[in-house]
């Protein structure tokens, strides 16, 4: 068996030499530590504090800019424009009691995001006067210093399938009211497909010359569709009925992932003559499955309660891995290939308005692990079922002398308990070790919102 890994982190101050070393590391098949994973900010934790605090149970009805990811149609719920800035910090301790490892902590690197989003009504650009809302949300890792966190590697001691640093999170979308309480929206999730080409002549000591490097990152647009129905406005717009206060929503998100392709050609003097050694690596990270979700909520006088059921089609990841040079499942016997299940995630949450200035909210969710196989040679992925609980508070400051609308502050906290699960870890020599994986994750989020 062989060890393969690729690791790439691009920041606003990256240098060509740093990228060269990263590509050269791939070319030399060196192992470097991983910090990224499958999933993304929106589904692993929650985009804004409201999403974090409610365990995403009310996210399909959230009028803030995070609606561009969860349900673009919800952008129509508030006609005012919005400018939001926030931060998210996730502390994680992912464990595996491997007797052959130096400790039981597999990963404890935090995920730290700075977020900014905006929503506005473009209806005034037309002569029709019909509202058309446009919104976007962007999140950058390491508090704005890391534009792309990407890694892919094999492991002989175990690595977690999800969690870790997240790549650039960017969503852009729009929505419009259609008819009597029915709104529709669409957005795109922007991911990056990076390619790197390196040609060089090297000595056995690693000194290179005649280097030629080309790096390119192209955006890939993945569709998100959503609709929101206010049942009272739709079925009894001019009178009271039992449907007043009820809303339902439906969303669809196509699968997405970040990908990197590296092509290199190295001539090693006195060892590998021209045309040299050609190496090609294609791999993915931050895979997010095709997702279908339906939700409903009931709003009373100063309170609301709601929930959603979300189907995530993780089985598609098996096909993605079959063409991945690092995961390399295409060359593995069918009985030993990694397997994934499609999963259903139930979510439930509530919000209560204490007074005109303060509101509290909470939510709970239970997520089964999509990882079906517990023995995955070379990859040795670990993943467990998890219980998610969140709490949050909002404060509205309305004594603003210069601003036209009140300022809103949101805080959210989320705890994720990863349940114990047994795995068989296989090292590169084929020796097997039984391990138990579990973990704890704490997420803190805050934001400030201005209306206009």
UniProtKB/Swiss-Prot annotation:
GO cellular component, as recorded: cell outer membrane
Keyword Protein biosynthesis belongs to the record: no
Pfam families from the UniProt entry: Toluene_X (PF03349)
Expression triggers: Expression increases during biofilm formation on n-hexadecane. Forms an operon with aupB.
Gene null: resulting phenotype: Mutants show a lower rate of biofilm formation on solid paraffin and on the liquid alkane n-hexadecane, while growth on nonalkane substrates was not affected. Planktonic growth on water-soluble substrates is not affected. Mutants are impaired in the assimilation of n-hexadecane solubilized in surfactant micelles.
Cellular compartment(s): Cell outer membrane
GO molecular function, one term: long-chain fatty acid transporting porin activity
Signal sequence interval, chain numbering: 1-36
Record-linked InterPro entries: Alkane_Uptake_OmpP1/FadL, OMPP1/FadL/TodX
Residue stretches in coiled coil: none
Keywords for the protein's UniProt record, in alphabetical order: Cell outer membrane, Membrane, Signal, Transmembrane, Transmembrane beta strand, Transport
Topology of the protein relative to the lipid bilayer: Multi-pass membrane protein
Main location: membrane
Annotated NCBIfam families: alkn_up_AupA
Family: Belongs to the OmpP1/FadL family.
Subunit structure: Interacts with the inner membrane protein AupB.
Function: Required for growth on alkanes. Probably involved in the uptake of micelle-solubilized alkanes.
Protein name, as recorded: Alkane uptake protein A
Gene that this polypeptide is encoded by: aupA
């Amino acid at each position: 068996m062989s060890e393969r890994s690729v690791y790439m982190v691009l920041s606003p101050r990256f240098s060509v030499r740093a990228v060269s070393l990263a590509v050269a590391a791939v070319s030399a098949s060196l192992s470097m530590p991983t910090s990224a994973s499958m999933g993304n900010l929106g589904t692993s934790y929650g985009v804004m504090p409201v999403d974090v605090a409610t365990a995403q149970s009310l996210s399909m009805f959230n009028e803030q800019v995070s609606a561009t990811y969860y349900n673009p149609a919800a952008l129509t719920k508030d006609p005012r424009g919005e400018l939001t800035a926030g931060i998210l910090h996730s502390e994680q301790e992912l464990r595996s009691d491997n007797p052959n490892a130096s400790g039981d902590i597999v990963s404890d690197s935090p995920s730290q995001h700075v977020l900014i989003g905006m929503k506005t009504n473009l209806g005034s650009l037309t002569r029709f006067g019909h509202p058309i809302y446009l919104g976007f949300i962007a999140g950058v890792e390491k508090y704005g210093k890391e534009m792309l966190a990407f890694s892919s590697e094999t492991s002989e001691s175990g690595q977690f399938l999800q969690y870790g640093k997240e790549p650039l999170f960017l969503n852009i979308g729009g929505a419009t009211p259609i008819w009597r309480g029915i709104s529709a929206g669409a957005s795109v999730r922007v991911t990056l497909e990076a390619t790197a080409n390196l040609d060089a002549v090297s000595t056995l000591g690693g000194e290179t010359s005649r280097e030629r490097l080309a790096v390119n990152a192209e955006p890939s647009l993945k569709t998100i569709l959503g609709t929101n129905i206010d049942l009272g406005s739709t079925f009894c717009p001019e009178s009271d009925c039992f449907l007043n206060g009820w809303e339902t929503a439906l969303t669809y998100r196509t699968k997405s992932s970040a990908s990197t392709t590296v092509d290199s050609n190295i001539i090693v003097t006195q060892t590998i003559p021209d045309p040299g050694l050609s190496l090609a690596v294609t791999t993915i990270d931050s895979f997010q499955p095709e997702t279908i979700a339906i939700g409903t909520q009931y709003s009373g006088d100063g309170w609301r309660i709601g929930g959603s059921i979300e189907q995530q089609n993780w089985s598609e990841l098996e096909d993605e891995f079959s063409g991945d040079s690092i995961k390399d499942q295409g060359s593995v016997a069918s009985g030993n290939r990694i397997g994934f299940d499609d999963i259903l995630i139930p979510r439930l949450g509530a919000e209560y308005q204490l007074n005109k200035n303060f509101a509290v909210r909470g939510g709970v969710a239970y997520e089964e692990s999509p990882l079906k196989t517990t023995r995955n040679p070379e990859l040795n992925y670990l993943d467990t079922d998890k219980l998610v609980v969140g709490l949050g508070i909002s404060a509205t400051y309305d004594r603003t002398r210069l601003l036209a609308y009140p300022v809103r502050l949101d805080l959210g906290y989320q705890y994720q308990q990863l349940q114990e699960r047994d795995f068989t870890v296989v090292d590169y020599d084929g020796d097997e070790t039984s391990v138990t994986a579990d973990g704890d994750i704490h997420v803190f989020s805050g934001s400030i919102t201005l209306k206009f």
